[in-house]
């Protein structure tokens, strides 16, 4: 296995309680890491003061304002100087050996990211029927190619991340930015792997739980449409998606609000070279990795 340098990046907004709970475990099981960095997204709960006092070796980047997840991650990655970086939500705990089993996958220079095994879940089995459909894959003990790497628990190759221009901040405050960069990576000829032995525990306590549920649902649906309109270029798939929009708008009149919100987010500037088509990506993901 090649020797890589790697760091850990944790974006956090008013996550003092979560960091107190999960950071000790991350430090314990990440002994060979070169650096641990917290990007504090304008917290008002004493996070920065706590970290400086209790964890002086942890680097803290403090945003004066709340920028949202995609921009905070991008700001953090600009300060990463290692070959790889581990992106973790502040509500994630890790297990012993989670890094070693994933980092070996980067021996292949085409691997952009390795998404970790959130033990209550598995790899996303993706298909297309007027829009992306996915369920959790049943074969949980074997590595698989994955359409994307989770923005809350994955390892990324810094050089490729930079080539792809990072997360597209059009998705702020968050949701679908990880799917977007994953799809762009595949189109550019890179691969993503889900690694079953790299086990982490997701507590589902992130800052997004503090959002109004209706507003959060609007953000999710809006960003989903932005993803399709930006990334899906196959003519047949685009027509199928248009049929879905027309039908869904007629049967769910409130959906027009989602469409308008998505239109207002366009155009987005982050586009990358396309070596693979949408159909080729769909044929490659979901397959076992050997």
Q: What do these predicted regions represent?
A:
Residues 147-165, 170-201:
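A short, conserved alpha-helix in the catalytic core of glycosyltransferases
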Residues 85:
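Short aromatic/hydrophobic "clamp" motif used to bind/position activated sugar donors
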Residues 129-147:
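Short, flexible, basic/aromatic active-site loop/helix in glycosyltransferases
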Residues 234-290:
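Non-catalytic, C-terminal membrane-associated alpha-helical segments of glycosyltransferases
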Residues 63-80:
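Glycine-rich, basic loop-to-helix element that forms the pyrophosphate-binding segment
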Residues 24-33:
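Short, acidic, metal-binding catalytic loop of nucleotide-sugar glycosyltransferases
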Residues 25, 40-49, 65, 92:
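A conserved acidic beta->alpha catalytic loop
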Residues 92-127:
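Conserved donor NDP-sugar-binding/catalytic core segment of glycosyltransferases
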């Amino acid at each position: 296995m090649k020797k890589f340098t790697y760091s850990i990046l944790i974006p956090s907004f008013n996550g003092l309680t979560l960091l107190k709970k999960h950071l000790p475990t991350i430090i314990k099981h990440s002994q060979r890491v070169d650096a641990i960095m917290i990007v504090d997204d304008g917290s008002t709960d004493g996070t920065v003061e706590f970290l400086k006092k209790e964890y002086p070796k942890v680097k803290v980047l403090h945003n004066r304002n709340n920028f949202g997840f995609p921009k905070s991650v991008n700001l953090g990655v600009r300060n990463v100087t290692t070959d790889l970086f581990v992106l973790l939500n502040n509500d994630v705990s890790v297990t012993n050996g989670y890094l070693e089993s994933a980092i070996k996958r980067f021996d292949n220079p085409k691997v952009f990211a390795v998404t970790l095994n959130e033990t209550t879940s598995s790899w996303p089995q993706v298909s297309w029927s007027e829009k992306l459909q996915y369920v959790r894959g049943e074969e949980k003990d074997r590595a698989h190619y994955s359409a994307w790497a989770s923005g809350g628990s994955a390892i990324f190759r810094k050089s490729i991340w930079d080539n792809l221009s990072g997360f597209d901040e059009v998705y702020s405050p968050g949701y679908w930015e990880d799917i977007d960069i994953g799809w762009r990576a595949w189109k550019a000829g890179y691969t993503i792997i889900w690694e079953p032995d790299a086990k982490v525990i997701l507590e589902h306590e992130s800052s997004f739980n503090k959002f109004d549920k209706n507003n959060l649902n609007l953000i999710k649906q809006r960003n989903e449409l932005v993803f399709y309109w930006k990334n899906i270029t196959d003519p047949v798939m685009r027509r199928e998606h248009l049929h879905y929009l027309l039908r869904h708008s007629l049967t769910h009149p409130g959906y027009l609000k989602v469409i308008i919100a998505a239109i207002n987010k366009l155009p987005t500037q982050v586009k990358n070279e396309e070596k693979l088509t949408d159909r080729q990506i769909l044929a490659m993901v979901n397959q076992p990795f050997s």
